[in-house]
Amino acid sequence: MANKTVLFNKHLESNAKMVDFHGWDMPLNYGSQIEEHHAVRQDAGMFDVSHMTVVDVTGTDACAFLRKLLANDVAKLKVPGKALYGGMLDDNAGIIDDLITYYLTDTFYRVVVNSATREKDLAWIAKQSQGFDVTVTERPELAMIAVQGPNAKAKAAAVFSSEQNAAIEGMKPFFGKQAGSLFIATTGYTGEVGYEIIVPETEAEALWQALLDQGVKPCGLGARDTLRLEAGMNLYGLDMDETINPLAANMGWTIAWEPTDRDFIGRKALEALRDAGTDKLVGLVMEEKGVLRHDMPVFFTDAAGVEQQGVITSGTFSPTLGYSIAMARVPNSIGDTAEVEMRKKRVAVRVVAPNFVRNGKQAF
């Protein structure tokens, strides 16, 4: 029996096509994935992300524990509400999950992890917390709605109370704040501005309906995937997993190497990988007809004249750009051109940074 979010009936009311997503019944689209994609790039769309796992870490050792658990360093978070993105690694520097951590007080952090990895994440966090004065509390009674797009903040403001709007006024990107019953964060998975709103399940349907009434378009997993890929954002299980280290997943920027005495889990293995050199995650652009897809092989000739091979991790047609884009894991020696094998022939592609669209505009 699949899990259903508290918004399941609202999806059916909007004629959603429901699919299984890691054991959850989730909307794939509400009629047109392309229209939903464009709504987020040009106006405002919303996603039910209540399947995500919210975990509160509290206690006198909360900071020390998270400094061990995560490759990024929560000690950098000085202002209440500030968040950071990073990887939770195993001893071999494989990525157990990627997650966002909010600093609320010195003894209270909120962590949002992926739904597909929920059970192994919770088990790993519980195991690693032994010996620390912390309490790890999953918050299944909380739902989450992401409102994204150039008009998302204005449309959400019409739904929030005057007190909530005052509480979040001027909030910078990558912050979260408790405003009444809502935890409102300036985060997202689309490359657009907007909010991710953590809401009690008892209030989620009313919030969804209020946003609908403001003209916010409901969007499904299909648009969520094309939007995140245009934005160059990794999807766990495709672009990285426990066999991949963050240096090979375009997550090097999320590793806090300093201070050198912070012994986070996976550090020694990661230092060895850094010194030896790893593959890297790049962007591919193909302006010919056709669509780049997961697992297609990528070929290029390096400076020494040797043919090298990589693989596409995520690929799609980009509705914003009008042609196909992909992320690919390739040897570090790649230049700015390559070939992808599709339908038994090789097609030329451009190699770019894995960031295709930001705030509705081409980013490369």
From Swiss-Prot:
GO terms for cellular component: cytosol; glycine cleavage complex. Keywords: Aminotransferase, Transferase. Signal peptide: none annotated. Its EC number is 2.1.2.10. The glycine cleavage system catalyzes the degradation of glycine. Belongs to the GcvT family. This is Aminomethyltransferase. It comes from Shewanella sp. (strain MR-7). The lineage of its organism: Bacteria, Pseudomonadati, Pseudomonadota, Gammaproteobacteria, Alteromonadales.
